[in-house]
Amino acid sequence: MEDDDEIQSIPSPGDSSLSPQAPPSPPILPTNDVTVAVVKKPQPGLSSQSPSMNALALVVHTPSVTGGGGSGNRNGRGGGGGSGGGGGGRDDCWSEEATKVLIEAWGDRFSEPGKGTLKQQHWKEVAEIVNKSRQCKYPKTDIQCKNRIDTVKKKYKQEKAKIASGDGPSKWVFFKKLESLIGGTTTFIASSKASEKAPMGGALGNSRSSMFKRQTKGNQIVQQQQEKRGSDSMRWHFRKRSASETESESDPEPEASPEESAESLPPLQPIQPLSFHMPKRLKVDKSGGGGSGVGDVARAILGFTEAYEKAETAKLKLMAELEKERMKFAKEMELQRMQFLKTQLEITQNNQEEEERSRQRGERRIVDDDDDRNGKNNGNVSS
């Protein structure tokens, strides 16, 4: 063996052109790969040849068995139960039994009232149920279960499209289960599309579509009439008369136009008349015979209206009296104001007259003084 190792470690430079080109060195393999080397003992006559002709190397890959979150080896093969970051695993990782368990667990939560769309907590519960069933080779995560359900839904839509195109019933094993879970929302759409696309005798398809339109429009008209009658019946009119005077016949039903009646009555399914009609006005019995609860409510409302009417009447009377008092007070105030103005005018006139008299007295005094002075001067001159 030592001679063999020496022969392998020293290649012949002269024979490098004659020997075939050595293959490139293999890449670094992971720890789970095993390399087996086989060395043949060289023959005496072929000692001058390259040792690469006698050395063979074989790489054996051992399967990497990991848990549910394995990331895969270096050769690009992902682990059996990936973490879900790469799309949640491939479809071939789900067996038929595992898919059945998944659909049942998902359907139980999907059909619960108020759920509709599952949250992350519900998907985790579904994943736990699938893992406990031990139908999967590797554990599944909530993201893988959600992606698998999306794939199953797409498959169901494809099968529905095939049925609508006339390929016959579906042979898919999970079709009936999904039809019971989510088939109610798509049955009407698929049937309408199939009736539009498939001719089915031409005139027959057109007559059915027109009949469906007439029936839909008729149902809308009936619904509007019911809403109108309901709103009219809630309008209660109370009067302050006796029971015999307050009784009145209900208004006749509005007659539909010929076009609406013809459209609202399809030939196959005629619209049934209403079973009862609520009166627009409530008949109030003041005798108090202890009837139904509606009569008690009506009597209570009637008493309330009478009390309210009395209060309003008293309020109007009080307001009229207050208005009279206000007008009387305003009249008195106006008279007092006029009296005050008259008094003020009299005082002003008196002051003016007093000033005039004082002015006249002053003028007279001045005249008298002048006369006295002139008389004295005349006496002195004559003397």
From Swiss-Prot:
One of its GO terms (cellular component) is nucleus. Keywords: Coiled coil, DNA-binding, Nucleus, Repressor, Transcription, Transcription regulation. Disulfide bonds: none annotated. Residues 263-274 have a biased composition (Low complexity). GO terms for molecular function: DNA-binding transcription factor activity; sequence-specific DNA binding; transcription cis-regulatory region binding. It is found in: Nucleus. Residues 66-88 have a biased composition (Gly residues). Residues 226-235, 356-367 have a biased composition (Basic and acidic residues). Residues 206-225 have a biased composition (Polar residues). It holds the Pfam family Myb_DNA-bind_4. Residues 1-32, 61-94, 189-295, 346-383 are annotated as: Disordered. Residues 94-153 form the Myb-like domain. The keyword Coiled coil applies. Residues 246-262 have a biased composition (Acidic residues). One of its GO terms (biological process) is regulation of DNA-templated transcription. Its main location: nucleus. A motif (Bipartite nuclear localization signal) lies at residues 228-241. Residues 304-365 form a coiled coil. Disruption phenotype: Reduced growth of leaves, petioles, stems and siliques. Delayed flowering. Transcription repressor that binds specific DNA sequence such as the GT-box-like motif 5'-CGTGATT-3' in the AT2S3 promoter. Negative regulator of seed maturation genes during seed germination and seedling development. May target GT-box-containing embryonic genes by competing with the binding of transcriptional activators to this promoter region. Contributes to the maintenance and control of seed filling and may repress the maturation program during early embryogenesis. This is Trihelix transcription factor ASIL1. The lineage of its organism: Eukaryota, Viridiplantae, Streptophyta, Embryophyta, Tracheophyta.
